[in-house]
Amino acid sequence: MSAKDQNPSPSSVELPLSRSVGYQIRTTHRLIQRYLQLRIHPHRVTLGMWYFLRVLWNEDGLTQRELSNRVGAMEPTTLSAILSMENRGLVKRVRDSHDRRKWNIFLTSKGRKLKDLTLPLAADVVNEAVAGFSEQEIDLLLKLLGAIQSNIGARLDEFDTQD
């Protein structure tokens, strides 16, 4: 087999959107996001806030950098979300007692209360997304998505070590 056969030219590669795992995951993610936004909107929570609140409900008091890493957001994006949530009275920033350069982000009582109001709505969105699936199918779906994440995560790590 020649090198040409092993590396087809870009124009000869076919990947219909219906067979593109990335495209299908992205489309599914966007639909779930849109539906979730509609469900949580009455509580004046944006999707941008939602991702940070979800992390803080489990790990209150993280630094801005830790919060960025957990959510997978750039630090300027995180700061913007924090300031917005702070203005809404959902979080407060407190200087780190060990390193005055860092801020720890803590939920306020108002921010904690949102968990009981919005988390059931998110659970409903997920349940509606997998309506008609058996528990085994849901387990398989989660296993396959986890494998994709591991595969791509390993490739990203390879790029990170090349720098």
Predicted regions located by residue number:
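A short, mixed-charge helix-start or loop-turn motif at secondary-structure junctions
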Residues: 10-19, 108
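Alpha-helical linker/hinge and terminal dimerization helices associated
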Residues: 28, 32, 71, 114-132, ...
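Conserved amphipathic alpha-helical interaction elements at protein-protein interfaces in regulatory
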Residues: 38, 42, 58, 84, ...
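Charged, amphipathic alpha-helical coiled-coil/dimerization segments
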Residues: 4, 83-146
